[in-house]
Amino acid sequence: MFTIDFSDHTGLVETSWFDQIDQLLTFAKKKENIHNDAELSVTFVDKDEIQNINKVYRDKDKVTDVISFALEEDEPEIDFNDFDIPRVLGDIIICTDVAKEQSESYGHSFERELGFLALHGFLHLLGYDHMNDNDEKEMFGRQDAILNEFGLTRN
């Protein structure tokens, strides 16, 4: 089972979009060969809240589109596939204000941008990063492949 706990602090995200994000992340989970049960949360916030989270937890006083807090920073200490317990991946926090701005700037739907940001955060929870060119190429390539195969394209 894959459990995603959604919370919308903004009132801007339609509950039907929770289902699409759930389907997208479930699809990504399979593509990333995570076979055991897993849990994560996705929270939608405004600019003030994400800036405060960045300031308090990341020592960066700025607004970002998405933040991920992974509970497993490195390799898990145990192989969760050997046990019948869920793997708690962490938290994804998405700024709806920035998502809306980016969707308009890129010329695609708000719903598509939310899916993109949720997947981006999910891949961070799995250990992907974009701190250097090679890592960025790998992460963004994986991200694009999953979005395209799922059918959530920029068009």
UniProtKB/Swiss-Prot annotation:
GO CC list: cytoplasm
Cofactor: Zn(2+)
UniProt enzyme class: hydrolase
EC nos: 3.1.-.-
Superkingdom field: Bacteria
GO process annotations (BP): rRNA processing
Subcellular location: Cytoplasm
Cofactor: binding comment: Binds 1 zinc ion.
Main location: cytoplasm
Function: Single strand-specific metallo-endoribonuclease involved in late-stage 70S ribosome quality control and in maturation of the 3' terminus of the 16S rRNA.
Family: Belongs to the endoribonuclease YbeY family.
Name of the featured protein: Endoribonuclease YbeY
